[in-house]
């Protein structure tokens, strides 16, 4: 059996104090609860045990054609120019060291 660790949505826009989702409180929660370091530690342990590492992230192309317009969380991403793929916003945070 193959084992894996799945890391979801640990992108700058969501968990960084400089991200556009700062007002939602995700970055503050992550900071107050040491989420990034705890996740980095879990990732390091998983790698040492030869787990497959899977990073999943949300993001939209420049024209936002994939954006779910009725989504409570992502419905206004285009208006705020948030979550653009291939930018700092949708890069996995440095703490997690994508390899």
Q: Residue locations for each model-derived region?
A:
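Active-site acidic carboxylates
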Residues: 1-95
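Gly-rich Lys/Arg/Thr-decorated short loops/hinges at beta-loop-alpha junctions or inter-strand turns
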Residues: 99
